[in-house]
Curated annotation (Swiss-Prot):
Keyword Transport: yes
Record GO terms (molecular function): transmembrane transporter activity
Species for this entry: Salmonella agona (strain SL483)
Transmembrane regions: 13-33, 38-58, 69-89, 93-113, 121-141, 152-172, 370-390, 407-427, 431-451, 459-479, 482-502
Function comment: Forms an efflux pump with AaeA. Could function as a metabolic relief valve, allowing to eliminate certain compounds when they accumulate to high levels in the cell.
Name of this chain's protein: p-hydroxybenzoic acid efflux pump subunit AaeB
Single biological process term from Gene Ontology: carboxylic acid transport
Cellular component GO terms held in the UniProt record: plasma membrane
Amino acid sequence: MGIFSIANQHIRFAVKLACAIVLALFIGFHFQLETPRWAVLTAAIVAAGPAFAAGGEPYSGAIRYRGMLRIIGTFIGCIAALIIIISMIRAPLLMILVCCVWAGFCTWISSLVRIENSYAWGLSGYTALIIVITIQTEPLLTPQFALERCSEIVIGIGCAILADLLFSPRSIKQEVDRELDSLLVAQYQLMQLCIKHGDSEEVDNAWGDLVRRTAALEGMRSNLNMESSRWVRANRRLKALNTLSLTLITQSCETYLIQNTRPELITDTFRELFETPVETVQDVHRQLKRMRRVIVWTGERETPVTLYSWVGAATRYLLLKRGVISNTKISATEEEILQGEPVVKVESAERHHAMVNFWRTTLSCILGTLFWLWTGWTSGNGAMVMIAVVTSLAMRLPNPRMVCIDFIYGTLAALPLGLLYFLVIIPNTQQSMLLLCLSLAVLGFFIGIEVQKRRLGSMGALASTINIIVLDNPMTFHFSQFLDSALGQIVGCMLAFIVILLVRDKSKDRTGRVLLNQFVSAAVSAMTTNVVRRKENRLPALYQQLFLLMNKFPGDLPKFRLALTMIIAHQRLRDAPIPVNEDLSVFHRQLRRTADHVISAGSDDKRRRYFGLLLDELDIYQEKLRIWEAPPQVTEPVKRLTGMLHKYQNALTDS
């Protein structure tokens, strides 16, 4: 397929994007809005953003969700702008500098919250800056300007959502159903590999792939939840299935590790059972029935705990999977599974990275302010807006440098494209609403094709072109103003790119160390006799951290193995029958405090000191377990955990 070819699967979304732009344009001019450009720009960004992220037509609900986030972010930004202006109207320079800090603060928050919700915070940062810059000449019009911006953005979002509904968006439900079946087969094949105890690299690749697929399934669940309220029951089941899938991975990998020291625990009966190849979910179902009969016949005590737990989790997975596919009423048995354990949310390990993003956004906005004041350029404010937009949106993504390059390419492409519309097309079509709508529909259609291909610069070109062509009411054609706006966009993107290059993000190694120490803390916190604490489900949070570690350090198998070993230790200690007495309870609290000190230590020396203290306390704890006659189900996991911490002490303490 050539560079400029059009695939059939791309046409529907391209028509949808063109329809959203035309609807926003028509409503903006029909109701005599002062700046219809905002409505058109919003419709284009809200519709095209999810398509660019997905690399194709987004699933149902994605555009609505992004639209709601944009509304929330706009209102937060407008309120912040009003507060800043009312408080500092007599000091314009201070007012702009505070807005720069506000943009940085919003970027800091957006780096810490879930990636799905970070868009709202990034948007609120540059919305306040846009309002403050725009009202510099007429500050008394601030409330009216904020109200107009909110109204036109809501209109643009409404047009994008309406266009999405008109062209029957894709449902993700069938993808979810297929992935649930495929995932269970892959889980069974992982357990086969672990019982064979073959090549460790093959096992690592298999469980790593399953971790990624389980994370992708959780993303599908979020999409399905946004799609329609009729999937509420399926959403509840999928939440539990996420935990069950992670449990299956953990039990399989623990089975592999156990055979490193005690291969005799896996009897020949189970080895023969797992030798049978499976291709479909029906094959897995038949094998599980055979295993349950064998477990009943041999007895729970004669079955390795990892296999017993794995078969139980796989059986519950099958039950909930059928419920997701049929979306029927939740049965009493399913309700018992769903009411299981409260899920603990993960604490962000990227606080240093978030602080780097804060300084990048704040410094780039301040640099733009100084450039504007020093040059006195009429479009310096436009450059400032682009700086805020680029840094606010780029910082929350894994590769902000490439986002900046995308914007630079887009603004460069927008100059000749905008010139064509400004000098030729719009002057000749402004007297006819039909021709004006058709001309912008053509723009939206062809850029919509490129957006789905994730063409570098396509998103930036769409937004930048709409921003510089004359879509105001009334239309005025001043070439110098057009050229200033176009050049302001390019200069703003360049300045943002320079700041991102100069303010280096060296937080990667620190984030990796914090993540590994959080795994250690989770394993230590599992040593407790508190009933409420033992019921907490930390597995999704731990695997979310493992997924982040895999993305930060692709191919670093020692780190992945260490993290997985800590997760296995956490799960085993969580279920271990620890003796209940006051002496051990007090010591559990002491262990948790020391583990927290390891995470929060500000220097390598402090971290080594607290880590050494933790190792000493674990030795004392093992002695206490011996005194209180704890069973092997407790002493062996604690001994393995202590040995792992001694072995990897340097990796867990050095920056």
